[in-house]
Amino acid sequence: MNPNQKIITIGSVSLTFAAICFLMQIAILVTTVTLNFKQYECDPPATNQVMPCEPIIIERNITEIVYLTNTTIEREICPKLVEYRNWSKPQCKITGFAPFSKDNSIRLSAGGDIWVTREPYVSCDPGRCYQFALGQGTTLDNKHSNDTIHDRTPHRTLLMNELGVPFHLGTRQVCIAWSSSSCHDGKAWLHVCITGYDKNATASFIYDGRLVDSIGSWSKNILRTQESECVCINGTCTVVMTDGSASGRADTRILFIEEGRIVHISPLSGSAQHVEECSCYPRYPGVRCICRDNWKGSNRPVVDINVKDYSINSSYVCSGLVGDTPRNNDRSSNSYCQNPNNEKGNHGVKGWAFDDGNDVWMGRTISEDSRSGYQTFKVIGGWSTPNSKLQINRQVIVDSDNRSGYSGIFSVEGKSCINRCFYVELIRGRRQETRVWWTSNSIVVFCGTSGTYGTGSWPDGADINLMPI
């Protein structure tokens, strides 16, 4: 074979090998793409709103005669449907409540930068739960914490953290507020934030991080709202707001809000005489609230909200074991479903209850006169029978030697039912503890359980002598 023939033969063989390698590279690439796209294949999106897609990176390092290195294929993940919550599942059947969360904010404040807060609450989006509180514009170990017993200042803001995370310096300040309510409609958060002068406050409605609407004070006397979660059904959120006397006749209105925009306002109707600081929960197809009568009754008002036609009805919890503080002792307390009981009605505390057929679950302080201790129980016939007093399944949440405060309800949707949970505000500092100049709180949270449970007490737990003054 002459030199030219050798060159031609070697060239032909090289070209053949190169062609084979090229074809194998194409085959490997096609196989990789096909397998990955089949693995993540999804149905076409429905007409509902979808979440923005995010790129997914697939990397393969393959060695096969030639080197195919860091092949990157970008594609969109399957669209995730986002729907309004309708809360149509039944309420979970429970035997009592089990411990869920405790943030220990005051104990942590002894050695860390933790916000001074009050009026805490809990609310959940479809994926996780968050704790809220009204901050005082200062941390506890800061001279600005002096005299933070006052409720309404321009420095107060609504704080939001994942449940169980204390309000540290990196906490998000959602809005300016000395009274608030928050809820998630399935697509985004709604925050109702009230601030301003007592005689001319403003309520801002913030939806999906944007200010959408507002309303000014209608009675020029401390416009205020729930201090716990609002409720959204099929895109319509309801929030109870009051403007007027805290110890006399006031003007309560129920606002209906869609994606941050006020679409309707209904006046309070029914037999409730005074309504403040409502603890609301979904009772499909409507919303039900248990509130505070700060004027005439130590029995709690009930507000029923019809989301479809905007109608309102109100009454009082029937249980003769009443829920407010101060109150008469259980032997002499009364409630007959329709009217305030005129028993130590002036003053009170935010609280909660919820119906369970003809019965009622409720929480209240252990003390009849002060915000000390906390207990829960079920009253047989307490929702439907006037002055019913048969109590079962009592639990102590905070023993009577320790302070409590506000409490409220929030709802969590499970696979088959809607569970009811509650939080208790554990107030520390002034007025009772005069060694320090600040007033703040931590929280403890319990949720309904169908299982068994033990006993205990979950107070704030901070030694006031170890705290900054």
Swiss-Prot record:
Record GO cellular component, one term: virion membrane
Regulation: Inhibited by the neuraminidase inhibitors zanamivir (Relenza) and oseltamivir (Tamiflu). These drugs interfere with the release of progeny virus from infected cells and are effective against all influenza strains. Resistance to neuraminidase inhibitors is quite rare.
Enzyme Commission numbers on file: 3.2.1.18
Residue ranges of the region described as Involved in apical transport and lipid raft association: 11-33
Residues involved in substrate binding: 118, 152, 276-277, 292, 371
Pfam families named in the record: Neur (PF00064)
Residues binding Ca(2+), per UniProt: 293, 297, 324
Location, primary (coarse class): virion
Virion surface side: 31-469
Top EC class, one word: hydrolase
Keyword list, A-Z: Calcium, Disulfide bond, Glycoprotein, Glycosidase, Host cell membrane, Host membrane, Hydrolase, Membrane, Metal-binding, Signal-anchor, Transmembrane, Transmembrane helix, Virion
Cited Gene3D superfamilies: 2.120.10.10
Ranges that cross the membrane: 10-30
GO terms of molecular function: exo-alpha-sialidase activity; metal ion binding
GO biological process: carbohydrate metabolic process; viral budding from plasma membrane
Localization per Swiss-Prot or TrEMBL: Virion membrane; Host apical cell membrane
Intravirion compartment segments: 1-9
Source organism superkingdom: Viruses
Disulfide-linked positions: 92-417, 124-129, 183-230, 232-237, 278-291, 280-289, 318-337, 421-447
HAMAP family for this protein: INFV_NRAM
Family statement drawn from the similarity comment of this UniProt entry: Belongs to the glycosyl hydrolase 34 family.
Anything else known: The influenza A genome consist of 8 RNA segments. Genetic variation of hemagglutinin and/or neuraminidase genes results in the emergence of new influenza strains. The mechanism of variation can be the result of point mutations or the result of genetic reassortment between segments of two different strains.
Job of this protein: Catalyzes the removal of terminal sialic acid residues from viral and cellular glycoconjugates. Cleaves off the terminal sialic acids on the glycosylated HA during virus budding to facilitate virus release. Additionally helps virus spread through the circulation by further removing sialic acids from the cell surface. These cleavages prevent self-aggregation and ensure the efficient spread of the progeny virus from cell to cell. Otherwise, infection would be limited to one round of replication.
Quaternary structure note: Homotetramer.
Designated name of the protein: Neuraminidase
Source taxonomy: Viruses, Riboviria, Orthornavirae, Negarnaviricota, Polyploviricotina
Gene (name only): NA
